[in-house]
A protein has these predicted regions:
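Structured, active/binding-site neighborhoods that engage oxygen-rich ligands
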Residues: 1-448
Length: 448
């Protein structure tokens, strides 16, 4: 598959946004406080964020995909388990942030970290032989590998190989099958939005006799027989593949079933897929994050509803040891991932991509549709005295055609009307994808 730069980076951008939308949606209803029944009885049919965050805190499901991929910054060639292990040691503060420090023999990641620190090399650090089968097959095998799928588009086998190597630092057995499955699905989503084809590509990268393949196929078979009742499928998972059958804090197999269920019953719709993954309970932010990446790539930017995308505002917070890396601008990171995608294919990086990755520099070009780069604007002027409409105009350079307009009431407190469509557009200076929008500001509402 030839990579057209703008099309490729927009898919990356959509996938990474999708991952973070899923994480943000699922995080407030994680276990152990939130059971399936409590989520159902409290929120019913979820169709939007259940918690309105002004600032969403760092989450391990975003930390891992960002920091473990930084092995590519320090090691040339195909990623190896030991290269990723060094990223673990280089970017984590022991006991603080990045992932769950739950204790040796309890938290898979904490156990692997201490193994590495004490001189146990990867992949032995995450092996069943070293840590036991239960610990090695927890959900972390698949929740930290989304970016490996994003940098290997339309090549599921290679994406799965990279993901297995990365996940083997801390996981083994079914944990590695989960890594391969999710990364392969993400990679396949660059060339098709067909959910069956995407899941087939994931299954092709894991042993047919594996428990992971069995739970995915069980869900698909149930869906074929009961295509309209995802809650019945969730009941089947509880009865036949539930937490009572698998040890540890958060085993990968029940959650693999949720990911498969959400993709089947979401039927290619981004929002419905992450919503179902969240309503299924168990590891809600992990599962919604994984399927959010897959569906984000498959559906593209146009498939991400504004009420989910806007609150992300192109910015996430991380919790690694390097403070300057902990505020991540998503559009800039998408260009960085695209650069790695070309490099890993052994192809020259197009100037359209390399020119937008500015090492050691803050650079916002707003070339990706709807990008905000984390910026917030608010009018602070008082209403126009004696004006029939109290109208103000704000003019600025905006990315794409999806805009936010702001107004200030008499009290001077900004009110935002996000996802408004600007009244008029005209092409701005290069690049041609920039548009100039004029937003009419009213004291009572924002009219665009």
């Amino acid at each position: 598959m030839a990579l057209e730069p703008m099309a490729y980076v927009q898919k990356i951008y959509a996938g990474f946004l999708g991952m973070n939308i899923g994480i943000r949606l699922g995080a407030p209803v994680e276990p152990a406080l939130w059971s399936y029944e409590r989520i159902r009885d409290t929120y019913g049919d979820i169709r939007s964020y259940v918690k309105d965050y002004k600032h969403f805190a760092a989450d391990d499901d975003a930390n891992g995909p960002v920091f473990f991929l930084r092995a590519l910054d320090d090691h040339a060639g195909e990623p190896t388990a030991q290269a990723v292990a060094e990223a673990w040691l280089n970017y984590a503060r022991e006991g603080v942030g990045l992932y769950w420090w739950g204790g040796y023999g309890i938290s898979t990641e904490h156990t692997a970290y201490l193994n590495l620190k004490n001189g146990v090399p990867a992949p032995q650090s995450g092996s069943i032989r070293q840590n036991g089968k239960t610990l090695a097959e927890q959900i972390g095998g698949q929740i930290f590998i989304d970016t490996w799928g994003l940098v290997v588009p339309a090549d599921p086998a290679r994406a799965a190989r990279y993901a297995r190597a990365a996940a083997s630092v801390s996981h083994d057995g079914e944990g590695l099958n989960g890594a391969a499955f999710i990364a392969a699905c993400i990679s396949k989503a660059f060339e098709t939005a067909d959910i069956d084809a995407i899941m087939d590509a994931g299954l092709a990268q894991i042993p047919q006799e594996s428990v992971y393949a069995a739970v995915v196929e069980a869900v698909r078979a149930f869906h074929r027989a009961n295509p309209d009742d995802w809650r019945a499928c969730r009941a089947m998972l509880e009865a036949e593949w539930g937490y009572d059958r698998y040890g540890g804090v958060c085993h990968i197999i029940p959650n693999a079933g949720v990911c498969a269920l959400a993709m089947c019953y979401g039927a290619g719709d981004f929002a419905r897929t992450v919503e179902i993954a969240t309503m299924c309970s168990w590891d809600t932010d992990c599962n919604a994050g994984n399927v959010g990446t897959i569906l984000g790539v498959a559906c593209g930017l146009e498939g991400l509803p504004a009420h989910y995308r806007d609150p992300i505002n192109d910015e996430i917070v991380l919790s690694g040891i390097s403070g300057y890396l902990n505020i991540l601008d998503i559009p800039s990171y998408a260009w960085e991932l695209a650069r790695w995608g070309y490099r890993l294919r052994g192809e020259p990086v197009p100037e359209e991509v390399s020119g937008r990755v500015r090492e050691g520099e803050v650079y916002f070009d707003f070339s990706l549709p709807g990008s905000t780069h984390g910026l917030r604007f608010a009018a602070t002027y008082p209403p126009a005295q004696g004006s029939e409409t109290d109208r103000y105009f704000w003019t600025g350079w905006c990315g794409g055609r999806r805009q936010s307009c702001f107004t200030s009431p008499s009290g001077g407190v900004p009110i935002s009307a996000t996802s408004a469509t600007c009244r008029s557009f005209r092409p701005g200076p290069t690049p041609a994808s920039r548009w100039k929008c004029a937003c009419a500001m009213r004291s009572s509402r924002a009219s665009c």
